[in-house]
Amino acid sequence: MSHPKLESSSNKEIITEEVGLLKQLLDEATQKLIGSESFDKIEKIVSLSSTDDYTGLKETISALSNEEMVIVSRYFSILPLLINISEDVDLAYEINYKNNLNQDYLGKLSTTIDVVAGHENAKDILEHVNVVPVLTAHPTQVQRKTVLELTSKIHDLLRKYRDVKAGIVNQEKWYADLRRYIGIIMQTDTIREKKLKVKNEITNVMEYYNRSLIKAVTKLTAEYKALAAKKGIHLENPKPLTMGMWIGGDRDGNPFVTAETLRLSAMVQSEVIINHYIEQLNELYRNMSLSINLTEVSPELVTLANQSQDNSVYRENEPYRKAFNFIQDKLVQTLLNLKVGSSPKEKFVSRQESSDIVGRYIKSHIAQVASDIQTEELPAYATAEEFKQDLLLVKQSLVQYGQDSLVDGELACLIQAVDIFGFYLATIDMRQDSSINEACVAELLKSANIVDDYSSLSEEEKCQLLLKELTEDPRTLSSTHAPKSELLQKELAIFQTARELKDQLGEDIINQHIISHTESVSDMFELAIMLKEVGLIDANQARIQIVPLFETIEDLDNSRDIMTQYLHYELVKKWIATNNNYQEIMLGYSDSNKDGGYLSSGWTLYKAQNELTKIGEENGIKITFFHGRGGTVGRGGGPSYEAITSQPFGSIKDRIRLTEQGEIIENKYGNQDAAYYNLEMLISASIDRMVTRMITNPNEIDNFRETMDGIVSESNAVYRNLVFDNPYFYDYFFEASPIKEVSSLNIGSRPAARKTITEISGLRAIPWVFSWSQNRIMFPGWYGVGSAFKHFIEQDEANLAKLQTMYQKWPFFNSLLSNVDMVLSKSNMNIALQYAQLAGSKEVRDVFNIILNEWQLTKDMILAIEQHDNLLEENPMLHASLDYRLPYFNVLNYVQIELIKRLRSNQLDEDYEKLIHITINGIATGLRNSG
């Protein structure tokens, strides 16, 4: 089932026009800063890049002084940013335009529900489907919050461009405002002077909730219910969308995530959503001026209104306003209690920290309300359900006395939001590496005199010992007075905080704990021991779900055996039963790709889902998958709709979670229109995959799978032969890419590696992919693909036709190849060659020739299977986008190469080193999916 492409004949023309205008204003701002003579050099560089005169471009840039590099780096970093804004505006405009012409245009969701309505269990499907985008703070979001705020203002202005052309908006004022903000952004630091802290990441991601996500999720849920109702399917409390969060709870490899950051993350989230509720109540208060002299109200509404402290004579006859006043005051008191606790012992954070956050998140008028009522000891809501019940009293009174129309709008949206977000906004995941859990459990067992050297036990001995502790002894191991290591204290503190947050904000604030590098059943039991220490798990129930993360090719291959053993235990079945019979499993796209290459990773993940789904069915358990996808193809990225619908049939029961990372968050959720569209696609894709079997012939799919097994084996061998067996590859990567500079870039709180990097396997997947994007090879998204297909076709010429059939009929294979097509189009081997020249020896530089040959072979094979003459034939929008952006951000690669040369030859003063970071930022912005 295809979905509508957002494209029209006017798109390229209008974007070209807008980009021309934005470039003109940027030219003016730049010229004003440096003068006409210096600006001539920028114009020359633009001309050389536009005509693909790489020799002239290289010579011109190498002749620039370090001081001249400053303005050149800034200019060509900001230009791709402005192009992105134009594309985002055009997307938002077309969403609205097409919706106005045809209500069902974006009606991908409408079409999906039409299909589902024909199923016998339609209501059950629609009632229980749940898609969870999980926002993360991996180091791929390179834009500063300040820059994002400025681009948001430019975005809002550019959205009025068509109205300006039509004479509806004053052109002179609009133009002056646009000129002003572009002038400001040209003089604003685009990179961070200091590395982000976890608390910065928390507040940064909250901007997306305030800007778009809360309203988009609420609106989409209401639309979902309405579309189902049109088909005669009346849903009770569906949650097609809920949100997840890693920031503050993901401590895998990040020593800066602690109990305090987990607490802060939960508190800030709570403040953001309660703030939203208070603002909506203000709207309702202003609008609901019904007089008791002109309409009747229910006794329950009168009781609610009479509790208000609003004693104004002007409100005596306005019970709805008084009711909303009381609800608002009670909600503000709830917020204050959450911030500082209802007693000193329950304080979340210090009063100074609370004051800082209030200043950021609470509007001045709400802060005033808080000040007024703080000494009154007003009641607060214990739960979000209590708050909802008060809102329902208002609704019932309106409906009872014929005011149904007043329920629609703000009140209905507010009730809907409370259903979705509660007082917690998004579920925070916890994550830690399995080795840390093992070290902590080993220490606990030793201090309790149970076993001196737990780590030396066999897997069977470990499981027997841990099972006994979990089922037979209710006591905690940490109750002894033995001294604890700093690591153990830190881990126990974060688990204890998790329990406190669940007690205070509700169970859904934290539902999962993910175990990185899960390699055995004991890895999961070790986490259970830690959870038991703070009362989050016992012999009968689990308040937090244990989620294994299978990352490497080997671990994915072993996942079936591991989960078969794990699900065999009666204790585990009890835990799963307390989670509505769901067992979540996380799949790692990044590490499996770095381990075996793109084809091997994709196919291993596909097979693992098939096998794990069957294991769940055999045990009467619903296996749900959490897809740890990044922005790039090398990390599982690509178009979301195609990515989801290409999963194995049956692998999506009714729930799916997936990570949304870095700059992908800005691209997808930077404004409400884009957020609505992208979230709609996630829901539609998930339901489509649940109910639609793309290939109905089982023999055909078996044949396709057998073919893939052979192809992937060859691809994996070719990939590993270069990455792990070639003695010069390690040096090539570190010398012919900006990995060293990427590692020092202040783009996230997490280190680039878990330890000192001495081999490729020790490098985190994100900087690995990020660096290959910077040098424009895009290596993780295609290497090994061409050789594998060539080898298969050489065995039998008829195999090409078989691959072409697979591309046409199998969504998984089609998505796989389409993604390779896309990354090849973003690569540039002329630029990559210049990076290769940075390598110190001929042997190291020669690695590039191996890569280049595979790149050309992969391109030839992809085009042959797709039966296309050129890349991106099926994606004209991306083709057009690259046409007008590549000439500008290609320049940044040449600037970056020259700066790296100067840095490595000690010709770049410390003051100018940050220019490399500016180019990294600009290239990532131009590519739009850096890591």
Swiss-Prot record:
Signal peptide range in chain numbering: none
Function comment: Forms oxaloacetate, a four-carbon dicarboxylic acid source for the tricarboxylic acid cycle.
Gene Ontology MF annotations: magnesium ion binding; phosphoenolpyruvate carboxylase activity
InterPro entries: PEP_COase (IPR021135), PEP_COase_bac/pln-type (IPR022805), PEP_COase_Lys_AS (IPR018129), PEPCASE_His_AS (IPR033129), Pyrv/PenolPyrv_kinase-like_dom (IPR015813)
Enzymatic reactions: oxaloacetate + phosphate = phosphoenolpyruvate + hydrogencarbonate
Gene: ppc
Annotated protein name in UniProt: Phosphoenolpyruvate carboxylase
Record key words, sorted: Carbon dioxide fixation, Lyase, Magnesium
Cofactor(s) needed for function: Mg(2+)
Family: Belongs to the PEPCase type 1 family.
BP-aspect Gene Ontology terms: carbon fixation; oxaloacetate metabolic process; tricarboxylic acid cycle
GO annotations of cellular component type: cytosol
